[in-house]
């Protein structure tokens, strides 16, 4: 039996992890939350009341829970928690289900992501406030570090830039991408090989999560992006990235993350369980995938 701890278990990520692992007879799931959450409804084994990650006692409390419950693998289920724990992996009393600290640090910042992949054709053009002229408009601004579509804005006229003056370090201002948005769910094995890349259309989005998602065929252009990112950045197990079509019909990268996506179930039901295989990989198994020719 593999004892798996999920924190915070009440996030959309934590709920998808529960759905992905709850029927596996080799997995014993334990949900952990700092505050009362929906995790208490779905996790049979549920622990509540651990301090926030900003507390000086958090790691001590976490390791006690890990030891008391004989936890083998911890799955972080929130972006800030992922980065925090990746920086303290050596202090943890169990395995951590995410990529290395460098990858987590890059992924948490859209600016760092674009800098690492600078020069690639799929990186959108970005601007500083002082460089923007009327002919560049419309543009799009989003926080460098953020989630859930919080703080985004479309820049239609020069006056809109007044809200962003002095905030070049806080925001990414890029070309406007007017086309359809997609998520590509990926898995990288221990050899660094991209095993799976499954693309889905984000038809309806609520607080940054696709609540209506449809599998689509992976275009050659997007497969090139997946391979290029996987070649430049080191992943271990599950990860995903998001792309959007530009005005010329080419795919441009929005962001990436070394974790389960909230709507990854759409790809999971085709036959490849991303987080389950990540757990097995952490436990020493070599992971392969067989193409599922399901007519979606």
Short names for language-model regions:
Residues 1-98:
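ATP-binding N-terminal substructure of ATP-dependent carboxylate-amine bond-forming enzymes
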Residues 40-42, 58-60, 105-112, 151, ...:
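Short, charged, surface-exposed secondary-structure boundary motifs
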Residues 104-180, 189-193, 220:
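Active-site nucleotide/adenylate-binding loops and adjacent lid/helix of ATP-dependent enzymes
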Residues 139, 195, 252-255:
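Protein kinase-like catalytic core scaffold
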Residues 169, 174-234, 245, 257-284:
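ATP-dependent carboxylate/phosphate-activation module, predominantly the ATP-grasp catalytic core
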Residues 236-248:
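A short glycine-rich, hydrophobically flanked beta-strand micro-motif that places a catalytic Asp/Glu
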Residues 286-296:
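Cysteine/selenocysteine-centered motifs that mediate thiol-based redox chemistry or coordinate metal-sulfur cofactors
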């Amino acid at each position: 039996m593999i004892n798996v701890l999920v924190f915070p278990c009440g996030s959309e990520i934590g709920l998808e992890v529960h759905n992905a692992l709850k029927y596996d007879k080799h997995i014993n799931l334990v949900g952990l939350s700092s505050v009362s959450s929906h995790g208490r409804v779905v996790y049979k084994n549920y622990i509540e009341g651990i301090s926030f990650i900003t507390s000086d006692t958090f790691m001590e409390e976490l390791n006690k829970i890990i030891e008391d419950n004989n936890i083998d693998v911890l799955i972080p289920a929130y972006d800030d928690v992922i980065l925090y724990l990746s920086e303290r992996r050596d202090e943890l009393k169990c395995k951590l289900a995410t990529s290395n600290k460098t990858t987590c640090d890059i992924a948490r910042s859209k600016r760092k992501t674009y800098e690492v992949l600078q020069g690639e054709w799929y990186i959108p053009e970005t601007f500083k406030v002082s460089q923007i002229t009327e002919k560049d408009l419309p543009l799009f601004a989003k926080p460098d570090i953020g989630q859930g579509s919080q703080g985004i804005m479309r820049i239609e006229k020069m006056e809109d830039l007044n809200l962003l003056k002095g905030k070049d370090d806080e925001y990414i201002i890029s070309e406007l991408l007017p086309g359809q948005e997609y998520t590509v769910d990926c898995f990288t094995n221990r050899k660094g090989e991209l095993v799976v890349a499954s693309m889905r259309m984000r038809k309806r989005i609520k607080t940054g999560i696709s609540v209506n998602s449809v599998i689509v065929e992976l275009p050659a252009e997007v497969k090139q992006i997946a391979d290029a990112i996987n070649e430049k950045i080191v992943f271990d197990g599950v990860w995903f990235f998001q792309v959007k079509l530009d005005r010329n019909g080419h795919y441009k990268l929005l962001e990436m993350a070394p974790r389960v996506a909230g709507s990854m179930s759409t790809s999971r039901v085709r036959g490849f369980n991303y987080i389950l295989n990540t757990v097995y990989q952490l436990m020493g198994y070599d992971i392969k995938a067989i193409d599922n020719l399901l007519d979606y």
